[in-house]
Amino acid sequence: AALDAGVRAIVCTPRAQNPTGVSLTAERAAQLRAVLAQHPYVLVIEDDHFSMLSREPYHSIIGPLHRRWALIRSVSKFLGPDMCLAVTASDPETAERLARRLSPGSTWVSHLLQRLVLALVSDDAVLAGVERAARHYRARNDRFAAELTRLGLPTAAGDGLSVWVRVPAPARAVAEQLMRRGWLARPGDEFVLADPAATHRLRLTVHDLSDTDLARLAADVAASARAIAPSPEASTAP
């Protein structure tokens, strides 16, 4: 509908979408490419921000004949926030338009920073560290999701730095309960313009937690949600 209405650009996160952690499957990417094939001049921007840390394959929605496109991969997720740089591949016209904006001044990208990033991503020891970090993030998310599921809150880990947790109560109220227990959680409606399902979601980041703290957080999420959620008896009472 948006394409038919004349939308000029689309931004897509193909992997580790924040906050949900979902990634495009090959089937879904193919479906979107087929739709976009009818609109080859709509600018398609893919923000593959998690790239080297992702545990999922990259599936693009940019078809081989699409005329306006850009694939962006930033490095700060795996090299740290000091490495404030992104690499872009695009069609020639989009590249030219971008180059005109990267003039000396606030949009200039330091050549020194570019060389430093190149040296880091070409270093085997650095790449091994990135791989260890990727495995760590996924393992911690998997463990937390399994713990929540064991406690009666079915959760899929997904990809990325956070876990998208469905709770059987308004997420804002659950987040307030968690704050009283010493945890800071982001309710799902902070990440959307209009999606009722997000009002029952929390975004939680757990990769820095010990096993003990991770289990305690999972227990606190479950307890907080159940303290607020209406009981089956109350919901079925006359």
Protein language model regions, located:
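Active-site phosphate-binding strand-loop segment of PLP-dependent enzymes
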Residues: 1-54
